[in-house]
Amino acid sequence: MSTIIDVYAREVLDSRGNPTVEVEVYTESGAFGRAIVPSGASTGEHEAVELRDGDKSRYLGKGVVNAVNNVNEIIAPEIAGFDVTDQAGIDRAMIELDGTPNKGKLGANAILGVSMAVAHAAADFVGLPLYRYLGGFNAKQLPTPMMNIINGGSHADNNVDFQEFMILPVGAPTFKESIRMGAEVFHALKAVLHDKGLNTAVGDEGGFAPNLGSNREALEVIIEAIEKAGYKAGENVFLGMDVASSEFYNKETGKYDLAGEGRTGLTSAEMVDFYEELCKDFPIISIEDGLDENDWDGHKLLTERIGDKVQLVGDDLFVTNTQKLAEGIEKGISNSILIKVNQIGTLTETFEAIEMAKRAGYTAVVSHRSGETEDATIADIAVATNAGQIKTGSMSRTDRIAKYNQLLRIEDELGEVAVYDGVKSFYNIKR
């Protein structure tokens, strides 16, 4: 047993130059843990509250001094004396201390920072890597990476409506080889875009952010890049999309406006038709947030039409919340959940969401946020839970590569027991 003797938070910066919360946990044994909280650009209405100061004279109102003070002045005294390995007890104590359904009093960014730092300190105390401490000796599956190589929507300053166009190197025999394949396609895409006279600057998540004629054109140039890199789309590499449709859903009309394509006033059924058409024309294996987070009828229709052959991921739809997920499971909506630790605010609740998804036959995709840091905790979480998939950006920007590098270290450490399932990680669809 090693008790917590001090918890300290500070304001640091994320990959967009915005403040976020870093937390350090100290124990009587000398074990130590540190974690930094990520932040999203496109956020679901039902996410746990990210506490910002709102003081326009500091960081344009995005400061997190209040969240930092909540850690140092309220949470720290409460959890001092806890056994650092009592993750569930510590998380529960913070949830009760906050006392709101959405962590709006103390802030999910304050609570999560402590939750993650506690896990790091506990792993340090028992002398195990974080993935092994959290997952035990069954933690051995490396996730299939979903690499966002073209950014659009709120993640880029371009005219592309859909937020992310991803490649999934499912044909690789190992995680290490999947990274090589992804990097080669990424560099091939840069050459393809350059030859077409298109911008090769990158967006928030490290993918390219060119102005394109349509969302379909984004898929076309990626196919060209896959072939240029020497791979075959639909065999070695599949495609995925995070549509983030809540970002272009018109609440006043109840319709979808694809401004980049000049198509407005689309109904839910017309959006579903569009996705079905794209899936016939391209080897798309995963679609995230195809309809607005509150358009459950639309999600139901999408699931009925293509849910047997395409992974349908709920991000804004489920917000890593077991109550939302349980409702989706009951109604037969989507077949996968995106797991973002800061949407719910504690590791304990994160693991509960993953477990609920697996019991229901849903896949779970561990995910970064668009505002990231050098913290690579989610890489360990993906392996600890044998999630099978991870979404953590493109093949550029250190804040994204940090997660891939950590997974490469884990695979190397696991050696022969490491498992990379590739296409088998999409176990609930027909491929």
Swiss-Prot record:
Alphabetized Pfam families for the sequence: Enolase_C (PF00113), Enolase_N (PF03952)
Major place of residence: cytoplasm
Catalyzed reaction equations: (2R)-2-phosphoglycerate = phosphoenolpyruvate + H2O
GO annotation, cellular component aspect: cell surface; extracellular region; phosphopyruvate hydratase complex
Group of enzyme by EC: lyase
Binding site for Mg(2+): 242, 288, 315
Pathway assigned in UniProt: Carbohydrate degradation; glycolysis; pyruvate from D-glyceraldehyde 3-phosphate: step 4/5
Organism domain of life: Bacteria
Catalytic machinery residues: 205 (proton donor), 340 (proton acceptor)
Cofactor: Mg(2+)
Molecular functions (GO terms): magnesium ion binding; phosphopyruvate hydratase activity
Name used for this protein in its record: Enolase
Lineage, broadest ranks: Bacteria, Bacillati, Bacillota, Bacilli, Bacillales
Gene giving rise to this polypeptide: eno
